[in-house]
Amino acid sequence: MRRVNILCSFALLFASHTSLAVTYPLPPEGSRLVGQSFTVTVPDHNTQPLETFAAQYGQGLSNMLEANPGADVFLPKSGSQLTIPQQLILPDTVRKGIVVNVAEMRLYYYPPDSNTVEVFPIGIGQAGRETPRNWVTTVERKQEAPTWTPTPNTRREYAKRGESLPAFVPAGPDNPMGLYAIYIGRLYAIHGTNANFGIGLRVSQGCIRLRNDDIKYLFDNVPVGTRVQIIDQPVKYTTEPDGSNWLEVHEPLSRNRAEYESDRKVPLPVTPSLRAFINGQEVDVNRANAALQRRSGMPVQISSGSRQMF
């Protein structure tokens, strides 16, 4: 996980970019596979960082890095191909309200009576200040132009880095919560940012961070009382109505500081149901194992006889 950690040090070099949700029609009953990934060509004489392309196509930096290993974060090579990972497997949970999957750093919003799902990239809590997992709560209130009162512990952490943090940060362009906040539970919020470098990274104090256009959309459209569920599913899988089997694997979140700072891959959680799925008669075990090793963050067809490349 060290690569993402290092990126945070340089992220303020990036320009600020807006984003828009990727909206998908809900699939028919029994299906969880939506969307389609595609590639784009980096323009000649490119001067833009990877964040520009991520924002343009509604992705976070982690999504782009998983799909494009080896891509230059600061200046993707002109003429190179970038995969935009817009195909995904919906999380294995109720399709209602807001669902946040911290492992893939995406927020899913199911607007009532719309038969669609809107997907937003997010930033989450840094190691040691994790965003809660396996939690169901509701939107308690919303606040335009929020203020921020850092906890004493947060101020101490900043002081250790040689940064002075005031006891109170008023609303405005210097507030790291951005211009809108949706408060969930009593201690956490879904909010904007004063710098888009955190989208797709673990950089917050535990809250959920979105690009500014995205949080404004949610602020305007998500009512108080909406159900919010936070899950941690680095591995998603589905057998579709046509019998095809798909596996989507993300880098799991590190469980402690040592894992976070290590170059080694964090072990994947292999549940009995996942093991049974992989060992099914219609699954190519070799392809499944390759997907578990590659961790591309994109659905891979692992049906026996499938010729999909990844």
UniProtKB/Swiss-Prot annotation:
Any one of the GO BP annotations: cell wall organization
Intrachain S-S bonds: none
Keyword Transport listed: no
Deletion phenotype: Simultaneous disruption of erfK, ybiS, ycfS and ynhG leads to loss of covalent anchoring of the major outer membrane lipoprotein (Lpp, also known as the Braun lipoprotein) to the peptidoglycan. Complementation with erfK restores some of this anchoring.
Subunit structure: Interacts with DsbG.
Protein task: Responsible, at least in part, for anchoring of the major outer membrane lipoprotein (Lpp, also known as the Braun lipoprotein) to the peptidoglycan via a meso-diaminopimelyl-L-Lys- bond on the terminal residue of Lpp.
Stated name of the protein: Probable L,D-transpeptidase ErfK/SrfK
Lineage start: Bacteria, Pseudomonadati, Pseudomonadota, Gammaproteobacteria, Enterobacterales
